[in-house]
Amino acid sequence: MQIEERIVEGHLLAARTTPGNTRRISFAKITEPLEVPQLLSLQTDSFDWLVGNDKWNAAVERRRSEGEDVSSKSGLQEIFEEISPIEDFSETMSLSFENPVFYDPKYTVDECKEKDFTYSAPLYVSAEFTNNDTGEIKGQTVFMGDFPLMTDKGTFIINGTERVVVSQLVRSPGVYFERTADKTSDKDIYTAKLIPSRGAWLEFEIDKRDMVGVRLDRKRKQNVTVLLKALGWTNEQIREEFGEYESMMLTLEKDHTQGQDDALLDIYRKLRPGEPPTREAAQTLLNNYYFNPKRYDLAKVGRYKINKKLGLLEAFDQQTLTIDDVVAAIKYIVALHDGREQIEAPQGTLDISADDIDHFGNRRMRTVGELIQNQLRTGLARMERVVRERMTTQDVEAITPQSLINIRPVVAALKEFFGTSQLSQFMDQTNPIAGLTHKRRLSALGPGGLSRDRAGMEVRDVHPSHYGRMCPIETPEGPNIGLIGSLASYGRINPFGFVETPYRKVTKGKVTDQIDYLTADDEDRYVIAQANAALDDKSRFVEERVLVRQRDGEVSEVLADEVDYMDVSPRQMVSVATALIPFLEHDDANRALMGANMQRQAVPLIKSDSPLVGTGIEYRAAVDAGDVVVATAAGVVKEVSADVIETMNDDGTYSTYRLAKFKRSNQGTCINQRPLVSEGDRLEIGTPIADGPCTDEAEMALGTNLLVAFMPWQGHNYEDAIILSQRLVQEDILTSIHIEEHEVDARDTKLGPEEITRDIPNVSEEMLADLDERGIIRIGAEVTTGDVLVGKVTPKGETELTPEERLLRAIFGEKAREVRDTSMKVPHGESGTVIGVRVFDREDGDELPPGVNQLVRVYVAQKRKISVGDKLAGRHGNKGVIAKILPIEDMPFMEDGTPVDVVLNPLGVPRRMNIGQILELHLGWLAKQGWDLNLNDDKSGADWKQRLIKIHADKAEPGTKVATPVFDGAREDEITGLLGSTIPNRDGVRMIDNTGKASLFDGRSGEPFPEPVAVGYMYILKLHHLVDDKIHARSTGPYSMITQQPLGGKAQFGGQRFGEMEVWAMEAYGAAYALQELLTIKSDDVPGRVKVYEAIVKGENIPDSGIPESFKVLVKEMQSLCLNVEVLSQDGTAIEMRDAEEDVFRAAEELGIDLSRREPSSVEEV
């Protein structure tokens, strides 16, 4: 009986975290017929197709049972079938591959992260060697290398680091027709391009003289009739097919080639100038260019696009060009030139039009699976060459598949792709939304894509066909703007690689629940209504005329019966990060772009706090991002601790969920998971059981809710500066934890092995106080700049011994150890607490790189409180830097004594037009205070009241969280009405009136401010631009090799540039001596620097400065241009420019200064 009670009670407890039962009151008026799809499926589905795992097979079976025509070949099967059989040059032997299989991975994901391994599984293939002469067949299972696997979160672990492969947007293979104006005449020039997935391009062009030309593989242009003749057509056939087109007849007249042979030779001369032309060579060349499957591949998508554009009925597996394709393309372009609107084709009548290259029907996605498949293809092609060579060199009797195959090129191709490709990127793990967005990113850059410098305005611009496919808001600022986008929240990718978006079918004015996914070129054929078109109870349009997007992308009003489809959701057009911005519809697009991008830079705070004003997508974003732990099976929680949750499942099995505790992310932020459930809680599949970084009750929580006032304060918040209350520092409200990893290894050197030890020469005992007997720092030690983390000594070269030393050594047999201190110390500007130490030792069986005997990693954590100079932002692109942190008693306060947390400048709002922040402010106050419509003095049944009662938002407790979805959120009249319905405080007073403003008092004088001030709760993020990472000071450090001036930048421990303008300022003040010091002894007067150092050490006066090194460089440069430059003294004698003198080196040696001129090779050296 007791157990049953526990389970029932557990069921109630679990209800607080089950999906769909969030505590938000939503202001949405539109019901959505479709859930947001799994947000990582872009990555996972593509990889599942590549490896052909059980999940993918199940999906194929399901779609086949629904009557879809789906290929059952995985990406790996496709590519091994493509390469098979590999035949030798005489075609007597062949080798074929089939049935790729994966064995279990050697290490788990966590082990790979810890030990710097790649998370991969061994791939085996069945290989068959056939001797065609004897008919003998030898079969073997061959190991094809370790194949990197994708984790559940859509990432790869490569050498211990988490990486993401970004999907690439490329021009789809197919046929494209363009019309451009000729610069010299007023005629149009028409071009057609047949673009394959790989192989040579075929381009047709009609110039201003109305001649139809063709270019093969971007070479010289020739008449198109030459190509047709080379393909076996006669003049009569050409006249019969194209007789009605003047341009073709004109071209035929100008073409003097006689018959097929003549045409082939003509083409050969143009493609291979200087080589003797023969008919066979010409025929082979043309076949290899366009009709050989090994050299030319349209891919399925190219065949699909050509069939669609030219109205052909070729089979999908016909992946080279056919003569029909060429003729149809010529026919299309001459008809387009002729001004016709339709032509007849095998599929029926075709509408003729030029193409828009930036249309999403002409751009497709190369997702992870395809990118890896292409890379494998390269590797296998290299392997094929090796196999061919070995077939000819080895003895036929002794050949086995294993002896022919060399897997090196395949492994190298994969390694190269994951390690160095532009599309394989170091994962952005600042917070969960950063990771999620990174995995959903669409990039037009990369191999086979565009380059920043050559991409024009048109490619970058928002296109109508992006609607519901690529977010028009979220893209980087700077040189990549518009080239990198983000998949819209409902978008998905079809088997051809085109992005589809869902619509609700409308039949005769009635909106059904049937969902159709349309690609961009399908969508162009339909009339589509917006998601906010009003519907009655029977799902019919309320209005007679509905606002729609027409077939050609124009917006207009049509009768309800003419509508074909309707949007599924108002947030269909935006990405996940953009959909997290409340009141997006009231923000200017430029600021919304900044808001979407800055959410990705928010650091996880110690206390996560989900927003009072959300948009309703917070739960899905957090769970799908993969940082929230969810139950994989239904059952009851058996045991909970900080790092493990054990559950008993309904089928009698047990599950163990391990939580990440204070792990370092790629960006140095802290990944920490906390349990959400208690023992005895009931779990269903998908129930969140632990929060991750930046999540609160399984909702995305990037920042914290703060009481904000919009008012100027003594000019301290001029130009976006922010004033904060000391309370946020004291109560650790904007405090984050940052973890740095420091690594040191002990190697074998030419002079002997390095050693990790506590016994370091010339280091005091107090410096070693926190090291253990191995010479490694203890966990829990507080360290600051310069402290030793790991003691290490490196052998020094043997020096010549004096006779006395030799005598002593002969007597005592003691060899004085010659070692130098190469310990790892805490770098400049860093400090914190040691929270973890990992030691890897070759003797203990750990795998280490060659030459490394020991490897030590030390993790140092810092608790960073908010401070002046840190950057804060809202979700509307309203960012600023903290200028002042005031004591709580000095902050402006409300009538009941509540001090505000943040003071923002009101002038930052009007010109930036991000009004969403003001609405968020007021709605945040409402959510914090709670409301009840019965408290409103306005007794009329106003519209806004009825709307709120209808969506059950007539009452809310204080602290209730609300959701205002994008394009369908709380309206201004609702907020104004609710401000008059807030629950008063315990004294029965409302602090804020109907206008959303309050009377504030100056904390310093106690006087009221003259005007009422807008006050409310706003969600504030702490961004990763922290002042501690940027502040930097230098004493002495590395110098540039040539100019001898200090290097620049914090990473190089560089100096501050004193530039031309600063010099002018010093000149203007007449500060001659200060300026001379800056330009010489503080910069690049090498002997002077040393002398000054010596003078300071000895307490003498500073000597005069000499000639700066950069002046000597200038003289040398002028001399190298054959200009005789001499430096003269006052009396007119030439001064010899000598290098640093002997005494400089003497002084330097005495003072222990290293004067060797060299650039530091790494930051560690600095």
UniProtKB/Swiss-Prot annotation:
Pfam families: RNA_pol_Rpb2_1, RNA_pol_Rpb2_2, RNA_pol_Rpb2_3, RNA_pol_Rpb2_45, RNA_pol_Rpb2_6, RNA_pol_Rpb2_7. The keyword Nucleotidyltransferase applies. Keywords: DNA-directed RNA polymerase, Nucleotidyltransferase, Transcription, Transferase. PROSITE patterns: RNA_POL_BETA. Its EC number is 2.7.7.6. CDD domains: RNA_pol_B_RPB2. It catalyses: RNA(n) + a ribonucleoside 5'-triphosphate = RNA(n+1) + diphosphate. One of its GO terms (biological process) is DNA-templated transcription. It comes from the Bacteria. The keyword Manganese does not apply. GO terms for cellular component: DNA-directed RNA polymerase complex. It is an enzyme of class 2 (transferase). GO terms for molecular function: DNA binding; DNA-directed RNA polymerase activity; ribonucleoside binding. The RNAP catalytic core consists of 2 alpha, 1 beta, 1 beta' and 1 omega subunit. When a sigma factor is associated with the core the holoenzyme is formed, which can initiate transcription. DNA-dependent RNA polymerase catalyzes the transcription of DNA into RNA using the four ribonucleoside triphosphates as substrates. PANTHER family: DNA-DIRECTED RNA POLYMERASE I SUBUNIT 2. Belongs to the RNA polymerase beta chain family. This is DNA-directed RNA polymerase subunit beta. It comes from Nocardioides sp. (strain ATCC BAA-499 / JS614).
